[in-house]
């Protein structure tokens, strides 16, 4: 491979879709706002506005997991590479997933120390990290992942209706939980249905993007400084 071709490939792979970063940053801001509301309530400073907090709890997780899926397929599409490099890419995904799980474990330890009555056993970071790892074999199905997504989401909703007494960590990961799960933990995102939402994001990303091109029109957002900041934050977040 000559030097010019290498430079062109690097340039090709470095292109980012700024709208994905904007949605990701918006989700982060809303998540932080939700945590502030929860902290104020937990420490008795101010009671939670149930309407606002409930809305955030419904919207923000979906945004996060959808963007994870979209980001996975978009980055995969940019890899018009040899099998050797493709393997390195999948290896990179697995390593990234384990790093995010590691951050989740740090949060688990932190919660055991500071909120021992309701610690985090399998929260959003654990779920995102594991979802990234097990998404690898699903990336080849591209837009057809909506079939798996629908099945897993429905299965997860069914699991949530089954009360399991004395569940193991495997039960909790899969979504088989005790009836009063929220009295035991402050952050719980089981693999089912949330991995289904990631697969739905992969399907949506395959429909909306082709390689380094959008399949829809969008104004030039990169000329605005806030959008550039979102791009930087998105590039250095848990993509």
Where are these regions (language model features)?
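Alpha-helical transmembrane segments and their immediate juxtamembrane cytosolic regions
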Residues: 1-239
